[in-house]
Amino acid sequence: MGSTAISTQQAFCSLQKFTPLSYASSCRSLRSRRKWAVPARCCSPATDVATAAKENRRELLKNGDDKLEICRVLNGMWQTSGGWGRIDRNDAVEAMLNYADDGLSTFDMADHYGPAEDLYGIFINRVRRERPPELLETVRGLTKWVPPPVKMTRSFVSESIDVSRRRMDVAALDMLQFHWWDYSNPGYLDALKHLTDLKGEGKIKTIALTNFDTERLRIILENGIPVVSNQVQHSIVDMRPQQKMAELCQLTGVKLITYGTVMGGLLSEKFLDTNLTIPFAGPALNTPSLQKYKRMVDAWGGWSLFQELLRTLKTVANKHGVSIPTVAVRFILDQPAVAGSMIGVRLGLSQHIKDANAVFSLVLDVEDISNILQVTNKGRDLQKVIGDCGDEYRRA
């Protein structure tokens, strides 16, 4: 392992007072996560950055014989569900092709994200017809199933999954991420057992979760459900997954896929040096994601502390010649158990391909990590304020 990787490992181990994991657990994790070693091959800088970026681009999720390789920066398609601007179907599919052509070939969606699954079906057919087989082999479509609290019969689960398969025009879903609203209803175990059977029939390649807490993840694994990942909210502001959840994931091999990593765009230059207390003085919080994550900022420490964080991130970004969102994503990708982080895409309206691809070659050093953690340590512990992962969706 080269000097950069060693210094980064030492930084995280020496800064444990800023992180929830124990010294031993965190250091074990860093030793086991080979990606730390990738950027340290410094004998030929230009070649090395390209090699590091290529090797750091994809991650294998697995549980037993179930495997799925994804791009570590995922294209989140919540923004197709309304509230972010009108989506033109043709423009959206062209944008998806652009992302895939530039190596950003994993798309995350849900059954309730408006036309997201339908757009993926059109997109994947374009890939089949117009792109080489090598690109098709790297494209991944991850969807979610968020059922109502009804009895989870085999026929109901199977019919629901068939809807997504038809919309996405695939014989087997690459990944089905399951969400459940009410833990007092144990039907989630029935649903997951039926999903496991459907996986055995070849209708699903991998089973995963979204917004499950640590206790329920443990129960699910104890029931023999082959979960490969749990999708949770995780950002520099919201470090809850690095408490109980990451420790269980490290023990079991389950990975984390994170969303809210750039906080709907709040973690960007656009909101640097702005004062939202003055009406119309700053950028409008005019999307569901901006409004959601502004509430998270308020719970964490308020706008003044958030501005201090943005200024610190801007200093780090300038040092490396990247943007604030790139730093924000890289920081979370380097956390234990994190396999991939999501950036929401406004297909056909704006794009972030350059910033997203810059994540793969960015290496945060000891000084960067220390400066960021000195600010975040001033914020409230959101585990105490909100609860464990996903608890924000289950409180009255």
Where are these regions (language model features)?
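N-terminal binding-site loop/beta-alpha segment at the start of enzyme catalytic domains
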Residues: 2-139
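Beta/alpha (TIM)-barrel catalytic core signal, keyed to glycine-rich beta->alpha loops juxtaposed to Asp/Glu
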Residues: 57-60, 181-383, 391-396
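Active-site mouth loops of central-metabolism enzymes
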Residues: 78-90, 145-156, 180-186
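Short, acidic/polar
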Residues: 86-100, 152-169, 190, 213-219
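A structural motif
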Residues: 101-104, 170-173, 204, 227, ...
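Short beta-strand segments at enzyme active-site cores
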Residues: 106-111, 173-177, 208-209, 326-328
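A short, structured active-site edge motif that brings together acidic residues
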Residues: 135-149, 176-178
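Active-site groove signature of glycoside hydrolases
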Residues: 165-187
